[in-house]
Amino acid sequence: MSWAARPPFLPQRHAAGQCGPVGVRKEMHCGVASRWRRRRPWLDPAAAAAAAVAGGEQQTPEPEPGEAGRDGMGDSGRDSRSPDSSSPNPLPQGVPPPSPPGPPLPPSTAPSLGGSGAPPPPPMPPPPLGSPFPVISSSMGSPGLPPPAPPGFSGPVSSPQINSTVSLPGGGSGPPEDVKPPVLGVRGLHCPPPPGGPGAGKRLCAICGDRSSGKHYGVYSCEGCKGFFKRTIRKDLTYSCRDNKDCTVDKRQRNRCQYCRYQKCLATGMKREAVQEERQRGKDKDGDGEGAGGAPEEMPVDRILEAELAVEQKSDQGVEGPGGTGGSGSSPNDPVTNICQAADKQLFTLVEWAKRIPHFSSLPLDDQVILLRAGWNELLIASFSHRSIDVRDGILLATGLHVHRNSAHSAGVGAIFDRVLTELVSKMRDMRMDKTELGCLRAIILFNPDAKGLSNPSEVEVLREKVYASLETYCKQKYPEQQGRFAKLLLRLPALRSIGLKCLEHLFFFKLIGDTPIDTFLMEMLEAPHQLA
């Protein structure tokens, strides 16, 4: 019998849920609706039945996001608009009945079970009747709920849906899964820097006030002042102040006056010997130099003292011998002439003194001439200045002549004469400089690595460093209570350099050496045999 020949009572059988193909489908659908009626008492059975008959064989439409959000269901396959058996006010076909608002759900910040951006999963069968909460919504959650938390979210999770029983396919229930709140990441915390970190305890340069890079040569200083002090010591540079020697030395004006900057380096406690020890340690690592402890043996101060005493005795013999210019009665009255004659006489003894200084004779002959030519004026000034310690307002020449301050002023050399008295003679008298210290200062002047024309300046510099070390050791042993004595001795070197240059102007003006070039004279003296042996 065909479906068209069915008797007209078939719809009644369908409505009663009896057998038949369409009736089977309606029977299944009505069974689902009956379960919905038991879970949703506010739905009207009459309205649901009328909607089921009117809908015929149409499939149940999928819930909209808004409806799913109000019913608390997501991708579980349940539809809040399922037709029921009856309704007092039947709606037109295809128009879903309005569902009453359900009880408000607590806000959930738990991440969704589905992947982000994935298509919605297929519908699932309804959960068991005893499930207290619906299945957690997927990534296509309702717009009424807050979006899922980002991966880096570190806030607490407080949703009762997390610990509820999750429905599994087939109507079974899985064990409850406790989702622990994520651990608070370190990026969300603000940790203050430790008190001993790199930002604490910043020191400033003791010379200019710039940021200090550490302790250099005994003082916290910046890289600029460290390099300035090292260059000054290694090259034995001398500076002069254009003002009153009280210039401001700070970060902006530290390069304005090198003299005041160098004096401030010494005043703050920078040690010249530390520069020499630093270079010596570098040579020890390379195996090219001796240790700092061996420097006094390489440049013994007793040999330097012997050289000073030998030259002094030779000068006394020349004064007392026949033909000597000693004695104030036989000397001319012009102080400039007396100084020129004494300087000419001292040039010979100066060469003999240099030959007695350790390691000087081992240098090439041309280098010996260059060193004597570069420092002969300072060497002679240092010698007669120390000889004049016991003389008041005057200097004592090697010929035994005494030149008074008034005579120098009358001859037109009073300005440079006063500088010799105040910057050299007076300072040597105050600190009671002995002959060993004088000999070491003169040896430092002699070994000048900055003299132009040297074949091996580094060798000369090594000899100067050995003199530095020997003099420092001598000061510590002879004057242990005077810790700054070594520095005071070295401070006389810039004054000697400045006064020596000024004296050269006067001496060349008065034609000290006449028509004989100084290079030829020194060469002849160096080639002569050692007469003071």
Curated annotation (Swiss-Prot):
Composed of three domains: a modulating N-terminal domain, a DNA-binding domain and a C-terminal ligand-binding domain. It is found in: Nucleus; Cytoplasm. Residues 1-23, 36-181, 276-299, 313-336 are annotated as: Disordered. Expressed in aortic endothelial cells (at protein level). Expressed in monocytes. Expressed in a variety of tumor cell lines. Keywords: Cytoplasm, DNA-binding, Metal-binding, Methylation, Nucleus, Receptor, Transcription, Transcription regulation, Zinc, Zinc-finger. This is Retinoic acid receptor RXR-beta. GO terms for cellular component: chromatin; cytosol; nucleolus; nucleoplasm; nucleus; RNA polymerase II transcription regulator complex. Residues 46-61, 132-143 have a biased composition (Low complexity). A zinc finger (NR C4-type) spans 205-225, 241-265. Residues 67-82, 276-288 have a biased composition (Basic and acidic residues). Residues 296-529 form the NR LBD domain. Receptor for retinoic acid. Retinoic acid receptors bind as heterodimers to their target response elements in response to their ligands, all-trans or 9-cis retinoic acid, and regulate gene expression in various biological processes. The RAR/RXR heterodimers bind to the retinoic acid response elements (RARE). PANTHER family: NUCLEAR HORMONE RECEPTOR. Homodimer (in vitro). Heterodimer with other retinoic acid receptor family members. Binds DNA preferentially as a RAR/RXR heterodimer. Interacts with NR1H3. Interacts with AKAP13.
